[in-house]
Amino acid sequence: MVPVVALVGRPNVGKSTLFNRLTRTRDALVADFPGLTRDRKYGQARLDEEHEFIVIDTGGIDGTEEGVETKMAEQSLAAIDEADVVLFLVDGRAGLTPADEAIAAHLRKIEKPAMLVVNKIDGIDADAACADFWQLGVDDMYQIAAAHGRGVTALLERALAPFFDDLLTSESEEGEIEDLTEFEDAEIAPDEYTEEEAEAEFQRLQEQPIKLAIIGRPNVGKSTLTNRILGEERVVVYDMPGTTRDSIYIPMERDGREYVIIDTAGVRRRGRINETVEKFSVVKTLKAVEDANVVLLVIDARENISDQDLSLLGFALNAGRSIVLAVNKWDGLDNEVKENVKKELDRRLGFVDFARIHFISALHGTGVGHLFESIQEAYKSATTRVGTSVLTRIMKMATDDHQPPMVRGRRIKLKYAHAGGYNPPIVVIHGNMVRELPDSYKRYLMNYFRKSLEIMGTPIRINFQNSENPFENRANKLTLSQERKRKRMMSVVKNRKK
């Protein structure tokens, strides 16, 4: 289960700053759903390569002490309900306010783990600034400087410890501010595997059912499509126990291949499909994407592609998931409208040109069966193992066709490539000065590998590693003849000085 962390507090206490730091973005627009989840932003975050979580920025809770409860009901109650843990942010420079007291009073009423976080304590006496906040009746408080990353890692370790058994919480003294700025600039280590680990991962993925997440905006036909798929296969539908925000996992089999349908809309009785109003939970959808192998994004052909569609697509890409696009409600459209829809898809979805697009009618079943051809193709592309010799040969062909650029008078040299992981496929390239490669050449290599390996339906990632020079720290050792020549030269130099 991917934990969900909600950031709650009044305006200007640093929620967006912390959100941007956790998601490693600059504009806090990681997964923004305007209109549907007003004033709440959703993003992927990682404490390290093994511990992922979803973070929600609730926006500011504004108003007086009397009005705070109303504002919270409008924009933050839903986020608090979705969250596994709440980080209640206050401003250490501004001190305690009536709005802070009202928020704290509400959090005490609900049975939800909450942590008081005093932000903006850099450059001031932190203990003195925090003194007033003990009036809120909390057992502990955590001091951070979100703008500089101080204390953020220790805070996250403490907040996420109940959800990860192997996560060691900080043993630092309460109130102590640690210099943990490595969270600010650190890059997440790429998912790298040895050859043996890559082979083991490939075998594991081939033996498991394909987990397919069906996602999309409300009322695009996700539930209709889910029931159409299940109805065609005549499987027994059951739902696994979970909370109200958990997706339903439905096992099924098609053409001898096992699948698990991750239904974010919930399973409906077949006779009541049209009576059901589709509910949309952002957290449920994002969790489904994280847990899936292949993501099936359903788009409404009768509406323009929205920012919500692009946000969901971007989230799936960032998670490295294989993608298949289903344009639903295609039946009944005249040819002119269909052509306009296709042009709009080409214009706005050019960044996922590797994904197959299907035009379907979930209600009547048109084109639904062909979806599984693309789903299997995408999964195979994401998990098929490619040997080091093949990857190195493709890399050599790419550099022969278009050499790497010169940097400070020296040409960047790529030596060899090997598989670094799957789902999504990762290619690791070793060479000299590879960190100096421009983004344009990296994109060229990515497209070259995709075309050569015929990878469809999945993103591909390339990691670059500088090859170590084995003689870098070793002093030159002269041969016997070179040593004699050196002595003669030194003797000549000394005689000239005399």
Swiss-Prot record:
Gene Ontology terms: biological process: ribosome biogenesis
Domain KH-like: 384-468
Sites where the protein binds GTP 2: 216-223, 263-267, 328-331
Gene Ontology MF, one: ribosome binding
Keyword Coiled coil listed: no
InterPro entries on file: AAA+_ATPase, G_ENGA, GTP-bd, GTPase_Der, KH_dom-like, KH_dom-like_a/b, P-loop_NTPase, Small_GTP-bd
Amino-acid positions noted as binding GTP 1 in the UniProt annotation, renumbered to this chain: 9-16, 57-61, 119-122
Matching SMART domains: AAA
Role according to the record: GTPase that plays an essential role in the late steps of ribosome biogenesis.
Family as reported in the entry's similarity comment: Belongs to the TRAFAC class TrmE-Era-EngA-EngB-Septin-like GTPase superfamily. EngA (Der) GTPase family.
Protein name: GTPase Der
